[in-house]
Amino acid sequence: MKMRFLGLVVCLVLWTLHSEGSGGKLTAVDPETNMNVSEIISYWGFPSEEYLVETEDGYILCLNRIPHGRKNHSDKGPKPVVFLQHGLLADSSNWVTNLANSSLGFILADAGFDVWMGNSRGNTWSRKHKTLSVSQDEFWAFSYDEMAKYDLPASINFILNKTGQEQVYYVGHSQGTTIGFIAFSQIPELAKRIKMFFALGPVASVAFCTSPMAKLGRLPDHLIKDLFGDKEFLPQSAFLKWLGTHVCTHVILKELCGNLCFLLCGFNERNLNMSRVDVYTTHSPAGTSVQNMLHWSQAVKFQKFQAFDWGSSAKNYFHYNQSYPPTYNVKDMLVPTAVWSGGHDWLADVYDVNILLTQITNLVFHESIPEWEHLDFIWGLDAPWRLYNKIINLMRKYQ
């Protein structure tokens, strides 16, 4: 039955692509669909730098940097540093795939900030390790636990050493907030290096999550492994690239591609720049590990903000010196925190966010945008004036 349905979908797509009745028209493929993040940054006239950072456990992460804007390059003085951390199944391109006047990475650079963008282990740009290869199961034995424990400290410490600054502003979206809550509550030395935490579409517990991803999360672990294997989950691939450049550029199917994004996150289709859908879909999804998805599955099933459950008391004892996974306590995080949430966000549900707000010890700002869903924070047409300007104002206030 599944194969018949898939065949029907493929036939429908092919018929639409070749149909004279629908015009069979393709819009021009955006050149950014075939660019890496550094090339996208340069394409828009910004300076671009790229660095490789090794974590304590041997993963090699890619950091992208926009050291200054297009107009303030003559200012040689030190600039306040901002670190942008993407969400689940995403990469650093999230911050630069809209137009230059509507992408947070570019807006911050033009506003006088030194902008750095992280890439979590296992995504398109962070698929290397000191001793392991992506073909080995061991490479993929990680979840957002390790991203918080190893990736964030390695990235932030590298940035501070490179810039000579003592603190950074941290902006996280989705899972980028999750690993921030973990790292800044568990590692006090790292928390002291965060001037302010900007949490966009924050996710800690997902007890009320209504995304179809939550339905997947309720499947037994063994069934998820049967479906997706033990290694990577939804990496960027040649097939996805083809879909982005041949299907998502079609005048009829472009809207379908946009709606597939909304299917997981909530609907606000009028706030998406449909001319950029091919750029979005050729960079996202950017992949993660199946184990990371299992961790999110556990968060849905157990309704707790806790470390990965290794499946037995013995294995948990080996990893944690206790028979059950330790719980993460957001209240232990003392970093000044500003939160933005969306009323139509299916991943960072309103009820989950309201619970989270009571746990943030140093909450300095919160705004809920009623009609926003999970992707509006990074791609929303109105994000520059509804969110990004406010972020910059808060950064300057707490400078």
Curated annotation (Swiss-Prot):
Gene3D superfamilies: alpha/beta hydrolase (3.40.50.1820)
Family: Belongs to the AB hydrolase superfamily. Lipase family.
Upper classification of the organism: Eukaryota, Metazoa, Chordata, Craniata, Vertebrata
Effect in UniProt of substituting residue 76 to R: No effect on enzyme activity
Tissues and organs where the protein is expressed, per its UniProt entry: Most abundantly expressed in brain, lung, kidney and mammary gland, a moderate expression seen in placenta and expressed at low levels in the liver and heart.
Record's protein name: Lysosomal acid lipase/cholesteryl ester hydrolase
Entry PTM: Glycosylation is not essential for catalytic activity.
Main location, first listed in the record: other
